[in-house]
Regions:
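Acidic, metal-coordinating catalytic segment for phosphate/diphosphate chemistry
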Residues: 1-38, 43
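Short loop segments at secondary-structure junctions
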Residues: 5-6, 41-44, 53, 118-123, ...
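Hydrophobic residues on conserved beta-strands that form the core of alpha/beta folds
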Residues: 11-12, 50, 64, 112
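A short, polar/proline- and glycine-enriched secondary-structure boundary/capping micro-motif
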Residues: 22-25, 58-63, 136
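Unchanged
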Residues: 33-36, 67-156, 170
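Ordered, amphipathic secondary-structure segments that act as subunit-interaction surfaces
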Residues: 39-61
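Short, amphipathic C-terminal "tail helix"
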Residues: 158-171
Length: 171
């Protein structure tokens, strides 16, 4: 509940992973919920993308590897764990880590760290039976073609477009 600038009482509903929000001060405490990864192979010729079923959309979309940060984990530790769980790949180098970003503005309070790096290994299905993920390496041309026909998550669309068009830093 809050009072808007005209003095009218209002209700605002949002989604949060924090079940204990009891004040504005609590809401404004900065925490990082998740990590996403923008990953290439060592030659930087391919980008790793997940093709996954998203229950909230009722369809498969292309996304970036990533997931929730467990209590006590750093974003880098979570990235290594999530990458292995989702794809079977190993994170061999981290080249950039962006500060936390508000990724669900208008809906929730989630903050996500975006990590850039190099991965290697053999793809395998997700170890989580609740996740329907097919991961693979994609060339720039393949990514451009997918952009014409398939749905992407917002982070994946932005960073894969940059990769496909030679605009991704360090690639």
């Amino acid at each position: 509940h809050y009072i808007d600038r005209t003095g009218c009482p209002r209700n605002y509903e949002m989604v949060s992973r924090d079940r204990n929000i009891d004040s504005l001060a609590h809401l404004q405490q900065h925490r990082t919920d998740a990590v996403v990864m923008v990953l290439t192979d060592a030659k930087r010729e391919h980008m790793a993308l997940n093709h996954e079923f998203r229950m909230e959309l009722g369809q498969r979309i292309y996304g970036l590897p990533g997931g929730l940060i467990e209590p006590g984990e750093t974003p880098e530790e979570a990235a290594r764990r999530e990458l292995g769980e989702e794809t079977g790949l190993q994170l061999v180098a981290i080249t950039h880590v962006l500060p936390p970003a508000a990724c669900t503005v208008g809906i929730g309070d989630e903050r996500t760290v975006c990590l850039f790096g190099i991965a290697e290994g053999t793809f395998r299905p997700s170890s989580d039976p609740m996740e329907e993920i097919e991961s693979a390496w994609y060339t720039r041309a393949q990514v451009r073609a997918l952009h014409e026909t398939d749905l992407f998550g917002s982070w994946a669309l932005a960073y894969s477009w940059m990769f496909a068009n030679g605009c991704l830093p360090g690639v």
